[in-house]
């Protein structure tokens, strides 16, 4: 049951790492932003290896839903852009899909 917690931590690491590149290339932030960005992306990759899954592809697929919702939280909390009803609806659909992949019975 620790997988959802790992996914949330991985999502924060991935989004922060990608945002460092976004900041450098699109917002004019200094090049040194890339160092914490790369460390954050390395932490993201490491965290996904800790997920309880027998197949990497399944771990990545179920992570996708968490990533999408975490991106919407980032949108609101860091970029000060409130998600609209379509963002929220899409996020809910993605979470349902991630739950099916993560906890679906395997035969």
From Swiss-Prot:
Location relative to the cell: Cell inner membrane
Topological relation to the membrane, as annotated: Multi-pass membrane protein
InterPro entries cross-referenced by the UniProt entry: UPF0060
Key words, A-Z: Cell inner membrane, Cell membrane, Membrane, Transmembrane, Transmembrane helix
Residues passing through the membrane, by range: 5-25, 31-51, 59-79, 85-105
GO cellular component: plasma membrane
Main subcellular location of this protein, as a coarse class: membrane
PANTHER family documented for this protein: UPF0060 MEMBRANE PROTEIN YNFA
Entry's family note: Belongs to the UPF0060 family.
HAMAP family: UPF0060
Protein's name in the database: UPF0060 membrane protein RPD_3084
